[in-house]
Curated annotation (Swiss-Prot):
Gene assigned in the entry: ndhB
This enzyme's EC code(s): 7.1.1.-
Keyword Thylakoid: yes
Keyword Cytoplasm carried by entry: no
Protein name per the record: NAD(P)H-quinone oxidoreductase subunit 2, chloroplastic
Length: 497
């Protein structure tokens, strides 16, 4: 029988993960042969693009299990795995220039990002407690190393230690919750088989509630949802900016997939209870994330608190508990990739040219670098939900799904806090476009403006251009994307009846 690559991609459940692992090994070996080779980034990007293509081939095919049922593949998991590979590829695009100029080892950073990507990919489809925990730790350990990657920077070392201690505590809590689930189910580890144990012990609510609370706390930490967000501002501020960009999307996507599958599959008998818990997390995250973001003076800290509020918006999709809520969550997550990574790319580029990330230092940027000011403005306005940018349509559909599901309080709070977010996003845009020379910051006054060119010349400029283009145009094709996603999720998804 002749080899059919399409059939191979469809029937190999973990083909995308295999591609990324092979790519990781090639980067490792190549760096041993030729340190900081120019091919390292190209190989990493090629592997991630190939993994994304493999996911496209798997899309809309019957659900499949592999490795004795430890990995589940359906359109829901494929969607989130695609989000992770795309966000990793964009993170590498916008980080390569930064790493080279900072004099840090490129191979190590790429290896950590690819390892975290593998952990995130497996976590999205993990179908038993062991696979979930191992995948989560693969993602977490790589993240700790990425945070402390700039080892000569005291702030990076401090951030790494904080993240390690708090991450270790959250892993311990979720492992404790898993031990309760294992005991309640009579020794089962597969997610679908844990349900009977929970149902049989519904008359012992304390045991079930302890297990649920531990799972929610562990996932809340990864989502950086309030009040489990304490690590986020300090880690975001102390970490290298490209690392922060990767965290803001990649780990959040993996945590969302895990939260949706764990809660929907394992705890259907107490659905109303965990809905209340998640509604509370969403409300607190949206309110406090936006209020505190409005007081920040650092761009990285502002985007950190903004990501907390974004987690609150995304949780609305989980609480909906239906195909439309999941579609809204995935749609908004796709728009979030490009507008958030685009904003971080602009912050990285400005930091490389000025050495600062303070909001006041962006004053008057338009006069020196109109293209960078325009790109950052587009991404921030999209994050704020200003039409006709992609962020507006993503938020609109997600909030509509929440309204149709009867989550009126959540939607009202989401709308009010979205208005609050406009204040701190527009504040940056306003300061960049001030025309008074005397109001320019000293950093902008001494800014070495590049020659004006519409064609990107470096990898970071390519990444920013791609994010800005998609953030601008995605809204015009959002309806076909929503329709296709909802139809295929309804046809093949295993977490929705």
């Amino acid at each position: 029988m002749p080899f059919d690559p399409l059939l191979f991609a469809q029937n190999t459940v973990i083909l995308p993960e295999i591609i990324v692992i092979v790519c990781l090994l090639i980067v490792l070996v190549l760096d041993l042969i030729q340190e900081n080779s120019a091919w390292l980034s190209t190989i990493s990007l090629t592997g991630l693009v190939a993994a994304t293509i493999a996911l496209v081939f798997q899309w809309n095919h019957p659900s499949a299990n592999d490795f004795l049922g430890s990995i589940q593949v359906d359109n829901f998991t494929i969607s989130f795995r695609g989000i992770i590979t795309i966000s990793s590829a964009l993170s590498i695009l916008i980080s390569t220039e930064y790493i080279k100029r900072a004099g840090m080892g490129l191979a190590e950073c790429l290896i950590f990002i690819l390892t975290a990507t593998v952990g995130g990919l497996f976590l999205c489809g993990a179908n038993n407690l062991v696979t979930v925990f191992v995948s989560l730790e693969c993602l977490s350990l790589s993240s700790y190393l990425l945070v402390g990657y700039a080892k000569k920077d005291v702030r990076s070392n401090e951030a790494s230690m904080k993240y390690l201690l708090m991450g270790g505590a959250s892993s311990s809590i979720i492992a404790y919750g898993f031990s309760w689930l294992y005991g309640l189910s009579g020794g089962e580890i597969e997610l679908s088989k844990l349900v009977d144990g929970i149902t049989n012990h519904i008359d012992e609510p304390i045991a079930v509630w302890v297990a649920l609370a531990c799972v929610v706390v562990g996932i809340g930490f990864k989502l950086s949802a309030f009040p489990f967000h304490q690590w986020t501002p300090d880690v975001y501020e102390g970490s290298p900016t490209p690392v922060v960009a990767f965290f803001s999307v990649g780990s959040k996507a993996a945590a969302l997939a895990l939260a949706t599958r764990m809660l929907s599959i394992v705890f259907p008998s107490i659905e109303s209870e965990w809905h209340v818990l998640l509604e509370l997390l969403a409300l607190l995250s949206m309110i406090f994330g936006n209020l505190i973001a409005a007081t920040q003076t650092s761009m990285k800290r502002m985007l950190a608190y903004s990501s907390i509020s974004q987690a609150g918006y995304l949780i609305i999709g989980i609480v909906c508990g239906n195909i439309y809520g999941y579609t809204g969550m995935i749609t908004y997550m796709v728009t979030y990739i490009f507008m958030n990574l685009g904003a971080f790319g602009c912050v990285i580029l400005f930091g490389l040219r000025t050495g600062t990330d303070q909001i006041r230092d962006y004053t008057g940027l338009y006069l020196k670098d109109p293209l960078l000011a325009f790109c950052l403005s587009v991404c921030l306005l999209s994050l704020a939900g200003i039409p006709p940018l992609a962020g507006f349509f993503g938020k609109l559909y997600l909030f509509w799904c929440g309204w149709k599901s009867g989550l009126y309080l959540l939607v009202y709070v989401a709308l009010i806090t979205s208005v609050i977010s406009m204040y701190y996003y527009l504040r940056v845009v306003k300061s960049m476009f001030t025309r008074e020379t005397k109001e320019q910051s000293s950093y902008v006054r001494n800014y070495l403006a590049p020659s004006l060119s519409l064609l990107p010349t470096t990898s970071i400029e390519v990444g920013i251009a791609l994010c800005v283009f998609i953030s601008t145009t995605l809204g015009f094709v959002i309806n076909p994307i929503i329709s296709a996603t909802s139809e295929t999720l309804l046809a093949t998804n295993t977490i929705v009846g």
